[in-house]
A protein has these predicted regions:
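Residue-level signal for alpha-helical context at structural boundaries
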Residues: 28, 66, 70, 118, ...
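Extended hydrophobic/aromatic-rich secondary-structure runs
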Residues: 59-62, 77-81, 142, 151-154, ...
């Protein structure tokens, strides 16, 4: 599967676990690519363009708590918020990194516009950035597998949850050359 097909599959799996999730992300804005380019310049990561050509993202004030997370603990920033997220991330890690997901505080998943690597970072006093996938395809394959292999679940409160041990197992299998997943 290509990036678009994997994203569609991930959204379908999210919808099965949390009905209403896709609708909560909103329709894409007609000028989404232009807005991203205006904020971050070019080239844009294809995954970022694919996402925002399908949806507009999770609004900061999402009405249903169970629909906030794209992955456990991280939401897809709404397109209107994305430029501010980019600026905050750029100050620490440079203009090559484009935010994908945000935890609402200092945590980000980001994609490198030059290498297509996906990384996690917390903009705290350490400001580390750790690669979690060598490319967007592996990143999406990992997310899809997390649903298909029951790593992701919905807890009794309707919130997206996950099994941390199983997440590492699945990620190591799909991303065998990434040190982040080799840590126990």
């Amino acid at each position: 599967m290509n990036i678009e097909q994997l994203l569609d599959r991930y959204l379908q799996l999210s919808e099965l676990k949390r009905p209403g999730y896709i609708e909560s992300l909103g329709l894409p804005l007609p000028d989404s690519t232009q807005q991203l380019e205006l904020a971050a310049g070019t080239p844009l990561a294809p995954l970022l363009v694919c996402i925002y050509n399908k949806v507009s993202g999770t609004p900061r004030q999402c009405k249903r708590e169970g629909l906030i997370d794209f992955i456990p603990g991280f939401r897809l920033p709404h397109l209107r918020e994305w430029p501010a997220a980019y600026e905050a991330f750029k100050l620490v890690h440079g203009e090559q990194w484009l935010p994908l997901l945000f935890d609402g505080d200092k945590g980000y998943y980001a994609i490198n516009r030059e290498t297509d690597e996906v990384a996690i970072s917390f903009l705290d006093e350490f400001a580390f950035i750790d690669t979690i996938s060598l490319n967007a395809l592996n990143f999406l394959q990992t997310l899809v597998a997390n649903y298909e292999r029951k790593v992701y679940s919905v807890d009794r409160y309707g919130l997206l949850d996950y099994d941390e041990r199983r997440e590492g197992e699945v990620a190591r299998e799909i991303n065998p050359d990434v040190d982040y997943w080799m840590e126990e």
